């Protein structure tokens, strides 16, 4: 990771740039400029059903209207591109394959209907829903491969270490924030349609682009524990 400040603003082109997004962009831009760092614009377009090129152009125009220039990103390039997630799919697949090989991820064959039934069963018992039941976590590689070869649809899930302990985040605003790793689900990193999830792609990109500081709203603080689940 670079010793100099590298921050990013990574909007999803599912609509126009809203006030909250503009605020986050300004904070990141100002932090980079104040510290002689690099401000990166990245387009997080992993939602294929809602992301459009038109919205991307609207966001770029809005950034310029705000007087924000970017050092790396669309139209200016950079050493860590491409800067659109749909152009980085091979990087996410390579990372997922490495996690599979290291035993840190596994294929999940559970259907949406099964997952919905688990939630409904918990509600019927008046118990809090504990998330994914990890029924595919302990399949042997041979069992999983046989189901893949049979054409059974599957997603990829991260294998959160069972003895991980607490996830501790040092936040510049809130100080030390602690999450109980036992409450962290074996979250999906690749959907059954072959596309990466937002949280997975974002973590991969931040690592590969050498991002030193993540400036975003409080509503995203809980996402940080997902990225640190194997640290």
Regions found by a protein language model. Give the residues of each.
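N-terminal Rossmann-like or analogous alpha/beta NTP/dinucleotide-binding catalytic cores
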Residues: 1-124, 193-195, 222-230
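Active-site cores that bind ATP or allylic diphosphates and position pyrophosphate for catalysis
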Residues: 101, 106-107, 111-230
């Amino acid at each position: 990771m670079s010793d100099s400040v590298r921050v990013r603003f990574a909007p999803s082109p599912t609509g126009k740039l809203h006030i909250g997004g503009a605020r986050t962009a300004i904070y990141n831009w100002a932090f980079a400029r104040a510290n002689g760092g690099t401000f990166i614009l990245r387009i997080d377009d992993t939602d294929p059903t809602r992301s459009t090129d038109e919205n991307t152009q609207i966001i770029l125009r809005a950034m310029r209207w705000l007087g924000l220039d970017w050092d790396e990103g669309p139209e200016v390039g950079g050493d860590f591109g491409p800067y659109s997630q749909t152009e980085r799919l091979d990087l996410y697949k390579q990372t997922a394959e490495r996690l599979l090989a290291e035993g840190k991820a596994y294929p999940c064959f559970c259907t949406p209907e099964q997952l919905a039934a688990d939630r409904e069963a918990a509600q019927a018992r008046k118990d809090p829903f504990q998330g994914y039941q990890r029924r595919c976590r302990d399949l042997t590689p041979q069992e999983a491969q046989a189901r893949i070869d049979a054409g059974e649809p599957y997603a990829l899930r991260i294998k959160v270490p069972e003895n991980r302990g607490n996830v501790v985040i040092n936040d510049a605003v809130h100080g030390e924030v602690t999450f109980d790793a036992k409450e962290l689900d074996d979250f999906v990193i690749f959907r059954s349609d072959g596309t990466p999830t937002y949280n997975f792609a974002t973590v991969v990109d931040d690592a590969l682009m050498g991002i030193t500081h993540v400036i975003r709203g409080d509503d995203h603080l809980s996402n940080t524990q997902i990225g640190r689940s194997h640290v």
